[in-house]
């Protein structure tokens, strides 16, 4: 009983690897953007608003 040749495995593997890479990269970028960058930028902006208010109060 002969088994036919396996075709399309390389192409399927490349597509799968690319898809998984893009999904994980996007999830990582979203985690960094909303988990680190946005809170840090908000904190920085609040600091400068407070600093400007103190400077204007003088």
From Swiss-Prot:
- Give the pro-peptide residues: 56-58
Keywords, sorted A to Z? Membrane, Mitochondrion, Mitochondrion inner membrane, Oxidoreductase, Transmembrane, Transmembrane helix
Q: Which GO terms describe its biological process?
A: mitochondrial electron transport, cytochrome c to oxygen; proton transmembrane transport
Disulphides:
none
In the UniProt record, the gene name given for this protein reads: cox9
Q: What family is this protein classified in?
A: Belongs to the fungal cytochrome c oxidase subunit 7a family.
Where found, per UniProt? Mitochondrion inner membrane
Q: Where are the transmembrane segments?
A: 15-34
Give ranges for the Mitochondrial matrix compartment. Answer: 1-14
Q: Would the keyword DNA-binding turn up in this protein's UniProt record?
A: no
Describe which pathway this protein belongs to, using the record's wording: Energy metabolism; oxidative phosphorylation
Assembly notes: Component of the cytochrome c oxidase (complex IV, CIV), a multisubunit enzyme composed of a catalytic core of 3 subunits and several supernumerary subunits. The complex exists as a monomer or a dimer and forms supercomplexes (SCs) in the inner mitochondrial membrane with ubiquinol-cytochrome c oxidoreductase (cytochrome b-c1 complex, complex III, CIII).
Q: Which residues lie on this side of the membrane: Mitochondrial intermembrane?
A: 35-55
Q: Molecular function terms in GO for this entry?
A: oxidoreductase activity
What is the name of this protein? Cytochrome c oxidase subunit 9, mitochondrial
Q: Which organism is it from?
A: Schizosaccharomyces pombe (strain 972 / ATCC 24843)
> Per the database entry, which stretches of residues form a coiled coil?
none
Query: What GO cellular component entries does it have?
Result: mitochondrial inner membrane; mitochondrion; respiratory chain complex IV
Query: What's its membrane topology?
Result: Single-pass membrane protein
Keyword NADP, does the record have it? no
The principal localisation class reads: mitochondrion
Protein role: Component of the cytochrome c oxidase, the last enzyme in the mitochondrial electron transport chain which drives oxidative phosphorylation. The respiratory chain contains 3 multisubunit complexes succinate dehydrogenase (complex II, CII), ubiquinol-cytochrome c oxidoreductase (cytochrome b-c1 complex, complex III, CIII) and cytochrome c oxidase (complex IV, CIV), that cooperate to transfer electrons derived from NADH and succinate to molecular oxygen, creating an electrochemical gradient over the inner membrane that drives transmembrane transport and the ATP synthase.
